[in-house]
Amino acid sequence: MEKNIPINKGNYEMDTEERSRLFEANRAYGWEKEYKEYRRHWVEYPKSQYVSEYPLLVDIELSALCNLKCPMCYTITEEFKSKVSRKFMEWDLFQKIVDEIAGKVPAVRLSLRGEATLHPDFVKCICYCKKKGIGEVSFLTNGSKLEPDFFIQIAEAGADWITVSIDGLNEQYEQIRSPLKFKDT
């Protein structure tokens, strides 16, 4: 792992206040009351050190596989590769997890360490979460598979929040996210 790449510990939004307000308003479409309560709990529970019966969000790792080899990522280390399964989660297990949390957990993030969009049933997973009443379905991605047709499938499936990792601009991005090209992102 390369040790000279500085780690960005910030999270920045580059948008107008009006667009941010509209985004938040639309983000809760169809479950406004529940969403407001869910987001209030995100703030209040940690402050009061309250532990609810169920978590507010469950991360479901569809796979620890990734199609990149970013120099700062621990998933490229031999230790990680030797200790963590690099297979796709089976559909039956995914269904079982979602069935167990449906109606109890308001949000699911379909990623953890790997690139979730590589899973062959990725769009089906989003659909299943929404069908079971999960209010907010999100995922993290390196963006490598977000071609227009696939992106449309993801949106139509009901994904609520997509976080795309962009670590730098132009050459710096290409150095980190190789073999991706910044102009294509």
Positions of PLM-derived features:
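Conserved Motif II region of HX4D acyltransferases
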Residues: 169
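Conserved alpha-helical substructure of the radical SAM core
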Residues: 2-161, 172-184
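Conserved phosphate-donor/acceptor-positioning beta-strand/loop module used by diverse small-molecule
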Residues: 164-166
